[in-house]
Swiss-Prot record:
Binding site for heme: C436
GO MF entries: heme binding; iron ion binding; monooxygenase activity; oxidoreductase activity, acting on paired donors, with incorporation or reduction of molecular oxygen
E.C. designation(s): 1.14.-.-
Keywords tagged on the record: Heme, Iron, Membrane, Metal-binding, Monooxygenase, Oxidoreductase, Transmembrane, Transmembrane helix
Record-given protein name: Cytochrome P450 71B11
Annotated membrane topology: Single-pass membrane protein
Statement: the UniProt record of this protein carries the keyword Iron: yes
Localization per record: Membrane
PROSITE patterns: CYTOCHROME_P450
Keyword Metal-binding tagged: yes
Disulfide bonds: none
Length: 496
């Protein structure tokens, strides 16, 4: 009799499992390419996943299902599907999946960018908008930006007098880093003991975050793979360097009573409870996690934007000539260039927008995770599915943009398309709850720098190079830098 009960129980539970699996298979999942055992579709990503995903979406549709190892993923590639993800179902799709190395670098997700959608995240995000990135605060650091840009202009003037090429990748990265470190810590990095440590941290963290992490897709064995490839040890090394940089910078801030009203000052006040953060009080690890976001997002993105704008200008002489003519007409012989001048430079603003369109700096937004079952584009998206938003695909879609491969700033003439997340055909900074909160701070530096570079100097390619030789290829990462550094020769003019 006991055997009979065992058989009945076995049949009963087997039936339940079969019914559940049948229900799962009846879900209307998005279409996608065939998968290989174990690795799924990883072999189809190539060296530039944003480009590979775009090509796959042309065959399988605007919402496409992929599998990366053990991770189920969907990719949204058109304004319509992306609008559903970032607006219609933003609350259901704005959490983050756990990613091993970003978690380590953000002190176990005590940041804003990689933290899942929780009450803590909502409070910290609100704090950044209300306290850190207000228009008033951005304006308060205008003098710092002007000083650092003036220093860059002095360097370029010397290079021009010697007819020496300038590595704009390097100089614009240093400019961005100097501004951010003064704004955040009140520290002038030039010649300080922290300068070399800072450069190691910025370069290393972006490399780690932008690397393929096997641990995210293959439980257990993935960690072994990352140890073999060296990613694990590299992350640990960078984390220790970053932690030391934060500790020394905070110590310097606390010891120098003349430093005040910078961003770290605000965060330390929150640690002490002098500024309320809902029911939370920041710990030192919370502060460091937030600093990780501010430094990496603020420094790398601004520098890369400026580099790419200059790249596309030098490779399009017509556009360069038109942009410089506008800047010189508006500024005329005014010595004091101010950030507000950008409001009268309509063509330069179009050039910046077109650069964002041709090469969005974050071509694949940081993955989102569905916090519950949701239906997008008529398809079922199960809970815990990773959601990739392919901004690069939207910006290169011929159904959205005429001649998408061409660099034509005039396409933004006489329209209201902007990068503030309301136009789903143009989303360089994302949209919705996860939209970049520091746009104002970053773009203030970008505009001021470009105005100075175009007003004060003419630019030419190194000897032996033609316009056709300018390399327009990007390297892949969380942010896409130029694969080949941009070397240009500045030429002194009457405005220098």
């Amino acid at each position: 009799m006991s055997l009979w009960y065992i058989i009945v129980a076995f049949v009963f539970f087997s039936t339940i499992i079969i019914v559940r699996n049948t229900r799962k298979t009846k879900k209307n999942l998005p279409p996608g390419p065939p998968r290989l055992p174990i690795i799924g579709n990883l072999h189809q990503l190539g060296s530039k996943p944003h480009s590979s995903m775009f090509k796959l979406s042309e065959k399988y549709g605007p919402l496409m299902a992929l599998r990366f190892g053990s991770v189920s993923t969907v990719v949204a590639s058109t304004p319509e599907t992306v609008k559903e993800v970032l607006k219609t179902f933003d609350a259901e799709c704005c959490s983050r999946p756990y990613m091993t190395y970003p978690a380590r670098l953000t002190y176990n997700l005590k940041d804003i960018g990689f933290c899942p959608y929780t009450k803590y995240w909502r409070e910290v995000r609100k704090m950044t908008v209300v306290e850190l990135y207000t228009a008033k605060r951005v304006q308060s650091f205008q003098h710092t930006r002007k000083e650092e840009v003036a220093s860059l202009v002095d360097f370029i003037t010397q290079a021009a007098s010697l007819e020496k090429p300038v590595n704009l990748n390097t100089k614009l990265m240093k400019l961005s880093g100097s501004v951010i470190c003064r704004v955040v810590f009140g520290i002038n990095l030039k010649g300080s003991k922290l300068e070399n440590l800072y450069e190691e941290v910025i370069q290393g963290t972006m490399e780690v975050v932008g690397s393929f992490a096997a641990a995210d897709y293959f439980p257990i064995i993935g960690r072994i793979i990352d140890r073999i490839t060296g990613l694990h040890s590299k992350c640990e090394k960078i984390f220790k360097a970053m932690d030391a940089f934060f500790d020394q910078s905070i110590k310097h801030h606390l010891e120098d009573e003349s430093i005040k009203d910078d961003i770290i000052d605000l965060l330390l006040k929150m640690e002490r409870g002098e500024i309320e953060l809902g029911e939370f009080q920041l710990t030192r690890d919370n502060t460091k996690g937030i600093l990780f976001n501010i430094l990496n997002a603020g420094i790398d993105t601004s520098a890369q934007v400026m580099t790419w704008v200059m790249t596309y200008l030098i490779s399009n002489p017509r556009v360069m000539k038109k942009a410089q003519a506008e800047v010189r007409e508006v500024i005329k012989n005014k010595d004091d260039i101010i950030e507000e001048d950008i409001e009268r430079l309509e063509y330069l603003k179009m050039v910046v927008k077109e650069t964002f369109r041709v090469l969005p700096l974050v071509p694949l937004l940081i993955p989102r995770e569905a916090s519950k079952d949701v239906k997008i584009g008529g398809y079922d998206i199960p809970k815990k599915t990773w959601i990739h938003v392919n901004i690069w695909a939207i910006h290169r879609n011929p159904n959205v943009w005429k001649d998408p491969e061409a660099f034509i700033p005039e396409r933004f003439m006489d329209n209201q398309i902007d990068y503030k997340g309301l136009n789903f055909e143009f989303l360089p900074f994302g949209s919705g709850r996860r939209m970049c909160p520091g746009i104002g701070m970053g773009m203030a530096l970008v505009h001021l720098t470009l105005i100075n570079l175009l007003y004060r100097f003419d630019w030419k390619l190194p000897e032996g190079m033609e316009v056709e030789d300018v390399d327009l290829e990007e390297s892949y990462g969380l942010v896409c830098p130029k694969k080949v550094p941009l070397q240009l020769i500045p030429v002194l003019t009457q405005w220098s």
